[in-house]
Amino acid sequence: VFALSIQPYINSSIIIQLLTVAIPALERLARDGGEEGKKKIQSITRYATVAIAILQAVGYYFMMKNYSLLEQDGIWVALVIIVTLIAGSSFVMWMGEQVTEFGVGNGISIILFAGILARIPNMASSMVTGVQKWSAIKAGTLTLDSLTSAGYTETQAQSYLDSALSPWGIVLLIIGMLLLIAFIVFINDAERRIPIQYAKRQVGRKMYGGQSSTLPMKVNMSGVLPVIFAQSIASLPITVWTFIGIPKEGTVSYSIYNAIDTKSVIYMVVYFIMIIGFSYFYSSIQFNPVEIANNLKKQGGFIPGFRPGQPTVQFIQKVLGRITLFGAIYLGIVAICPLIVGKVINNGSLAIGGTSVIIVVGVALETVKALENQMLMRQYKGFLE
């Protein structure tokens, strides 16, 4: 029922946000429409979600048909499967919106968070299996010959043996994951603060202004969105290929399939480039240097050493470009590092994707902050005190 999960909503959000930049009418609606404009865009996103869910549900039906997973087939069976998948995806979208409106934090992020945590038992099981393989290899009971005699091909047997993990390998994986989480937490809170000075002005007998402040610019301004969207687009060819059927070994199609597989080097390079591109795209949407400079000018503020107006805009754009580049490279490295580890140890089930790690850490931090704010609003002590 929930096989499509929240993916149609994520894909529709990508499309609508790209169209918001490309279509002037949508851009005006997002910029000048206020709360009503946001509701209209949200409504358009819902309709787009249903449309994408229909396409993906049809794809899932044909995938099950190609792999002979259906005991019965026919127009009514197809209709029931497609409608059920669409209903499940729509329900997940509705549930996420309810959590956002009445709960704590972003509902869609929390659903993704829960889905990622649900995979941890499988990862732990893979670790145990990997250690058992390693022990059997050391004891001499698991060899290439024993696997080939059991019906494995030589390639399959070698791949099976390569997925073995030593206890020290598990320890290094856990330490690496903890260091990665600590790095994500550090970068998530890192920011560049631009000093702001406000000119003094006299109103009647009172003197106003003269104080100093800062303009904070987060290093990872766009959050996890570039990674989510880049992953959705980069994995689209493989998803489509899975729907129509994986090609047979030894064919040209199979070679192309392997070349763009999510474990291939080509996929990692394309994925990394897309993350950088989406990071710049979202930074330009969320932070407008011209608007910031105009607001500072209206409030009598200025950046020391730069005149109000175009010089201020150019300085903010320069700082924004540097921060965005650093944040984009950080996101790219964090996203592909677990993929590289999974490729090296030949055990993809152990490598929770960098996307997943960023989502888990980011959602956890945002939820803690949201709970802190809720408790402080009710005059209770902080959540961590």
Role assignments for model-derived ranges:
Residues 1-385:
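N-terminal cationic and glycine-rich segments that engage phosphates or anionic surfaces
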